[in-house]
């Protein structure tokens, strides 16, 4: 079923998306991703640990399915996520899986072919089978591989949240989720808090203490041989003591009602962690026909994605005006909160070095403040560690790259963009693109070369028509009328001096570190920066150029 779903999804993708998914780079990473998913499966199902969030895991599986579509391997071993968790105890009724509906359109389509549907939170815990004989709890079996699990009966008998004796002497099989009790837990604000791993770890112990046992609850989500009417199932379960099921079950008729409850449970307090909602059709197959596969009568709709798994295509190093080096990760485009993300900052050179991110790695990204893409962590490393042209941080600083020396284009371009921006001279019609064109045309090799450009020199630049040339030249000429204080900002004077300026350039140059320290609000570090700036030979040469050009204050 899932194979068919992925095939349908891929067939609907635009050609450019298919090309990216089936790139040569992807071919090299198929086996690495498959092995990582196998390890995650083993940790999750056998050890009860979640080394990666569910949403990143789901995306990794989806990506692997895409790549297998691109690069089929006839001899590949089928992937069985639950294989390592198989136990020795057979389930009386198999545990089915859940089809994961990707969006509202998929949910709407699913609802359109079903009736008498109910919705519940998708409790983030560990699945179990409960077997009652003559009303007494006889056995609790971990999910395992869905057919065979582990006997957790001894620990289960210590858990107050599990009904030990039913009021009716009935033989009964239930399926549900053991969860860790949380007080007023809001999933959208707090996430999963590793609640599932905690329960799994406790249940896998040889001895479960009373305090830990009291922290475990039970949510029954299936009564395979129960009455046909969903309402009767709920009321009976409540009468027997399984109160969560009725409390957190709602009938729905359409996508609007499904979306309402999904948003409500995501943003309102619950006594457990959850990672989405589950849609149940009241009518289901007879219990003896249940299999470890996705059934037609139930499906999951996960909560909104807060993280995206992204493949790194390249790492570029941007050098800013002050010489700060910022590694930028170029990504295979991914969607996050209805936005397409194709690049993200690694923050600082030091952080990039500590993470050691290379092309071919998979990283987790999220949105800071729901707006700015943010790098979280490396999820999977490529076995091939590509060499990268990492800039030497010792060569770039606040006083480097006033000219187009080797390796200086990035910083010089950043300086010019600052100069023409609102924080500098506020030159109309002049931005980073304009400066880049002028540099590529060979008309600018130094910070102030543009001061003497005229219309004739701009005549041979492709894309510069008469109107553009006239606007650029007029903007450059207007710079000569800017006041001295504005020019100082454009040059990049350290900020502490901008509101404490008295006198012209010569007055400022004459101040040494002690003189700067005497000004209120300027500490030793800033004083040293100011002194170094005004005494730097390159800066003094720029000041002389501005003096000759007749700029105020120089």
UniProtKB/Swiss-Prot annotation:
Its EC number is 6.5.1.2. Transmembrane segments: none annotated. Coiled coil: none annotated. The keyword RNA-binding does not apply. GO terms for biological process: DNA repair; DNA replication. Pfam families: DNA_ligase_aden (PF01653), DNA_ligase_OB (PF03120). One of its GO terms (molecular function) is DNA ligase (NAD+) activity. It catalyses: NAD(+) + (deoxyribonucleotide)n-3'-hydroxyl + 5'-phospho-(deoxyribonucleotide)m = (deoxyribonucleotide)n+m + AMP + beta-nicotinamide D-nucleotide. InterPro entries: DNA_ligase, DNA_ligase_B, DNAligase_adenylation, DNAligase_N, NA-bd_OB-fold, NAD_dep_DNA_ligaseB, NAD_DNA_ligase_OB, RuvA_2-like. Keywords: DNA damage, DNA repair, DNA replication, Ligase, NAD. It is an enzyme of class 6 (ligase). The active site is at 122 (n6-amp-lysine intermediate). Gene3D superfamilies: 5' to 3' exonuclease, C-terminal subdomain, DNA ligase/mRNA capping enzyme, Helix hairpin bin, Nucleic acid-binding proteins. Catalyzes the formation of phosphodiester linkages between 5'-phosphoryl and 3'-hydroxyl groups in double-stranded DNA using NAD as a coenzyme and as the energy source for the reaction. Belongs to the NAD-dependent DNA ligase family. LigB subfamily. NCBIfam families: PRK08097.1. This is DNA ligase B.
